[in-house]
Amino acid sequence: MVGFPEYVGVVKDYLLVIEDKADLAKHIKLDDKGNISAETAAITDYAVNGAVFYGKHLAENTSYKKVIVFGVSGDEKKHKITPVYIDETEFHRELLEVESFISFNEDNIDEYYIREILKENTD
């Protein structure tokens, strides 16, 4: 049906998936209920939709319990990075946009997970 994500990597026990589109207009497509569309055309043409599709597939077919996917669109100067968390049940939740991937390196990813995904205070 569709190809492969641009990037798949592992940081600690997190599986990270990046789907990239050059055009900001191809960042995300929502359905009429405001959810991330799972239509084939949306998966192939939009960054976030493709990332969620790949992430769900990997959550289902690997042993990873924590999958964070990123829909990335635009270029270096003007871009959007939308992370979406997917757990082993394939539940997914769109997270706040980020400016870069610094929160997802080995030193920061656990704190990001606790603060942004579990919604617990890390102070």
Regions found by a protein language model. Give the residues of each.
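Domain-level recognition of nuclease-like catalytic cores that cleave nucleotide substrates
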Residues: 56-120
